[in-house]
């Protein structure tokens, strides 16, 4: 039986499993998947022929992993302890391992085992959950959170306090995806499997879930669940049909190409909106 088949079958029987009853072959399979997610050789979602494909079986392995162990005390230096069932990614790393990985981790940043942090990425005091993929050159700024199985592209900047939703709680079908070269402004939230396409700029305080209307003021088109590539997005509202009230919406105020994005600062793009 293949690794994928073992995970798929185990997921069907997941309610039968506990740390005490988990079969050894299932335990080994889950740990193998977690190790591959941890070193980046496997991803919960990947782009193939221009479309995002979700490896649902890998996500199922992440969900199963919470049945592997009971909570246990995890020490972090002399004065800090955690009580959890998932180990942290860097708990046993040496200086040589950090240098080889090429990542910068600023205390007290935490990444869970089973997340991947690519070379050149910087974790300010932040949190990266299990199954997440943070690609090369990404900046996860202070108090930003990268949810379980979320996919963060190359050179993405997640500003202070940004929340990128996960798939575990509440259970979601697909991970939230931030494609390459995106900027997510402070305190914004992108959740529920929304895809922010390449080069988009999200202003401070924008909240986008699957039901959020994303209104393009140039075309009048309304998107849901996807921010088109190169969009510059700010918070706003749209009027009701009877004109009695307005409801929140994300507003695409302009589109920029890669050349303009490279020559123009994020602040300028938003200020000129």
From Swiss-Prot:
Enzyme Commission code(s) on record: 2.3.1.117
Enzyme class: transferase
Pfam families linked: Hexapep_2, THDPS_N_2
Gene Ontology CC entries for this record: cytoplasm
Keyword Nucleotide-binding: no
Cellular localisation: Cytoplasm
Record key words, sorted: Acyltransferase, Amino-acid biosynthesis, Cytoplasm, Diaminopimelate biosynthesis, Lysine biosynthesis, Repeat, Transferase
Similarity field: Belongs to the transferase hexapeptide repeat family.
Protein name, as recorded: 2,3,4,5-tetrahydropyridine-2,6-dicarboxylate N-succinyltransferase
Species this protein is from: Psychrobacter arcticus (strain DSM 17307 / VKM B-2377 / 273-4)
């Amino acid at each position: 039986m293949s690794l994928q088949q073992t995970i798929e079958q185990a997921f069907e029987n997941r309610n039968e499993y506990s740390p005490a009853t988990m079969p050894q072959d299932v335990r080994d399979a889950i740990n193998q998947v977690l190790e591959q997610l941890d070193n980046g050789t496997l991803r919960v979602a990947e782009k193939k022929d221009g479309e995002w494909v979700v490896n649902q079986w890998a996500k199922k392995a992440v969900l199963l992993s919470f049945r592997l162990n009971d909570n246990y005390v995890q020490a972090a230096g002399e004065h800090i302890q955690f009580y959890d069932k998932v180990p942290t990614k860097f708990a046993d790393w040496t200086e040589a391992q950090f240098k080889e990985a090429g990542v910068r981790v600023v205390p007290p940043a935490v990444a869970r085992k089973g997340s991947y942090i690519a070379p050149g990425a910087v974790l300010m005091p932040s949190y990266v959950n299990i199954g997440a993929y943070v690609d090369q050159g990404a900046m996860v700024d202070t108090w930003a959170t990268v949810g379980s199985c979320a996919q963060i592209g190359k050179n993405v900047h997640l500003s202070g306090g940004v929340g990128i939703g996960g798939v575990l709680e509440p259970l979601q079908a697909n991970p939230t995806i931030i494609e390459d070269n995106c900027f997510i402004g402070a305190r914004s939230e992108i959740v529920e499997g929304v895809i922010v396409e390449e080069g988009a700029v999200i202003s401070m305080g924008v909240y986008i879930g699957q039901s959020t209307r994303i209104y393009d003021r140039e075309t009048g088109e309304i998107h849901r669940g996807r921010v088109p590539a190169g969009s510059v997005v700010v918070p706003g509202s749209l009027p009701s049909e009877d004109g009695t009230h307005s409801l929140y919406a994300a507003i695409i105020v302009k589109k920029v190409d890669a050349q303009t994005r490279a020559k123009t600062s994020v602040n300028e793009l938003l200020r000129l909106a």
